[in-house]
From Swiss-Prot:
Pathway: Glycan degradation; chitin degradation. Its EC number is 3.2.1.52. Catalyzes the cleavage of beta-N-acetylglucosaminides and beta-N-acetylgalactosaminides. Also catalyzes the hydrolysis of N-acetylchitooligomers. May be involved in chitin degradation. It is not able to cleave beta-glucosides. The keyword Translocase does not apply. Keywords: Carbohydrate metabolism, Chitin degradation, Glycosidase, Hydrolase, Polysaccharide degradation. The gene is hex20. InterPro entries: Beta_hexosaminidase_sua/sub (IPR025705), Glyco_hydro_20_cat (IPR015883), Glycoside_hydrolase_SF (IPR017853), Hex-like_dom2 (IPR029018), HEX_bac_N (IPR015882). One of its GO terms (cellular component) is membrane. One of its GO terms (biological process) is polysaccharide catabolic process. Belongs to the glycosyl hydrolase 20 family. The reaction mechanism involves an oxazolinium ion intermediate. GO terms for molecular function: beta-N-acetylhexosaminidase activity. It comes from Cellulomonas fimi. This is Beta-N-acetylhexosaminidase.
Length: 496
């Protein structure tokens, strides 16, 4: 029997005696008729059909079929929306979950356990999996402002997130180099500032229909979108579009470099607050998720009281729109409403304000630059990426513990883990995935799996078996020297 190389590692995975389940032309997929279950069933049938090369029929009843994959909702599972149970025997696969999202996670596990025999037969070993995530927030932040990535690029990344049971796509939509989302109340933002990027490239933006397409793609895979408009710094794209946001009244020049900290909004200008209300109200209306990210990072030329007033105002607009507020760790130095999500990233900053905010009731999202910033170079020879937080090899992305990373932060305040990839040096999907893989799989396991169940040697063996999948779907990836990767022409194995 081939090794079972599931990532993230489940709470319980045990192989059982008995012959494997064989995916055949007679295999059907059975779900109840609830709309959300039908959507998961169609997704599962599509995944299995892609593996087998033949369609898998979705039905509401088994009807005596000899080979069945059954998806059901069940309360007989640990608490948590994403808990699931997967049981595989010779003639059937039974999947139970507390929610549609849990069924999606189970289908991913099933997909990762499918193996191909030498004659092309697809099998799943007899096994039992009981699983649920450690953290409810497991995400990836993608900077689409420095370089623009198309809807198709993002769909490919959404598929990758789902494959590693990540459930948040955080889109950094604005920065000095470009404004990437069309807002009905401020159409001049994309007219003036969408056509630029780092190095002078063409840029781009998402119109409302395209943003909705991204939202639909992620919803089918149990992933929520957290959109970010970064204020009160990183705003040169905004001040280039609207001169009334500058003291001179004149628009700023286009910026295509990679420096940070030079641009900001002005607390005392009459145009500033209407601008903030317009952009955050529009953004909240365009995305169905609970959260909107207000940025707040790297405002290096602004009086702190003025900074705090603008952060507070932006947060109030987001709350007025019915959303919860997320911001980078710098907002922890301002008055925060309980439940605000503060995202840790800067390993060089004084952690005291961040710790104080967590102790006062803020929720903590862990994205340490030295562990989870996947635009950092792997080593000094890496052609792409930056180095301000050091080099991050695969084991660096794996061997860290979110709950104890910052002394004084209450472990119960940590709601999740989010990797981030900034795109100053990344211009296309291939370059992006070469920095994400294999490190994204490592961060995903940190976010899903309890620390006592994580083991580097075990993980490195499992992740090696994922390389053929990355090759099959066309993802570029980094062959970390810390892993014994399979060579060309390896024996048949994982088919996922």
């Amino acid at each position: 029997m081939p090794d079972v190389a599931v990532i993230p590692r489940p709470v319980l995975l045990e192989t059982t005696d008995g012959p494997p389940f064989v995916l055949t032309a007679a295999t059907i997929l059975v779900v109840d008729s609830a709309p959300e279950l039908v959507a998961v069933g169609v997704l599962a049938a599509d995944l299995l059909g892609r593996l087998s090369g033949r369609p898998v029929e979705v039905r509401y009843t088994e009807g005596g079929a000899p080979s069945v994959v059954r998806l059901r909702l069940s309360e007989d599972l640990p608490a948590g929306d994403e808990a699931y149970r997967l049981v595989v025997s010779e003639h059937r696969v039974d999947i139970d979950a507390r929610s549609a999202a849990g069924l999606v996670r189970a289908v991913v596990t099933l997909r990762q356990t499918v193996s191909s025999l030498g004659d092309g037969t697809l099998t799943v070993p007899a096994l039992r999996v009981e699983d649920h995530p450690r953290y409810a927030w497991r995400g990836l932040s993608i900077d689409v402002a420095r370089h623009f990535f198309t809807v198709d690029d993002l769909k490919a990344i959404i598929g990758l997130l789902a494959h590693y049971k990540l459930n948040v796509l955080h889109l950094h939509l604005t920065d000095d180099q470009g404004w990437r989302v069309h807002l009905p109340s401020r159409p001049h933002l994309t007219r003036a500032s969408a056509g630029t990027s780092v190095g002078g490239g063409p840029g781009g933006f998402y119109n409302p229909a395209q943003l909705a397409e991204i939202v639909v793609a992620r919803a089918a895979r149990g992933i929520r979108v957290v959109p970010e408009i970064d204020v009160p710094g990183h705003v040169n794209a905004a001040t280039h579009a609207y001169g009334d946001l500058t003291p001179s009244g004149e628009p700023t020049d286009v910026y295509t470099g990679i420096e940070v900290g030079f641009s900001r909004l002005h607390d005392d200008l009459p145009a500033t607050r209407p601008f903030l209300r317009d952009v955050f109200t529009d953004l909240a209306a365009m995305t169905p998720g609970e959260y909107v990210h207000i940025g707040g990072d790297e405002v290096l030329t602004m009086d702190h009281d003025k900074y705090a007033r603008l952060v507070g105002y932006a947060a109030s607009v987001v709350r007025d729109a019915g959303k919860k507020v997320v911001g980078w760790q710098e907002i922890s130095s301002t008055p925060l409403e309980p439940g605000t999500v503060v995202q840790y990233w800067d390993i060089n900053a004084d952690p005291a304000p961040f710790v104080a905010a967590a102790q006062a009731g803020a929720h903590v999202l862990m994205s340490p630059g030295s562990r989870a910033y996947l635009d950092m170079k792997y080593d000094a020879t890496t052609e792409l990426g930056l180095e301000w937080a050091g080099h991050i090899e695969l084991r660096d992305a794996y061997d860290w513990e979110p709950s104890t990373l910052i002394p004084g932060v209450p472990p119960e305040s940590v709601i999740g883990v989010e990797a981030a990839v900034w795109t100053e040096t990344l211009t296309d999907l291939g370059e992006l995935t070469s920095m994400l893989l294999p490190r994204l799989a490592a961060v995903a396991e940190v976010a899903w799996t309890a620390p006592q169940d994580r083991d580097w040697d075990d993980f490195s063996g499992r992740v090696a078996q994922h390389a053929p999948f990355w090759d099959r779907v066309g993802f570029r990836w980094h062959a970390s020297p810390q892993v014994s990767w399979p060579g060309p022409g390896s024996a048949p194995g994982a088919a996922f």
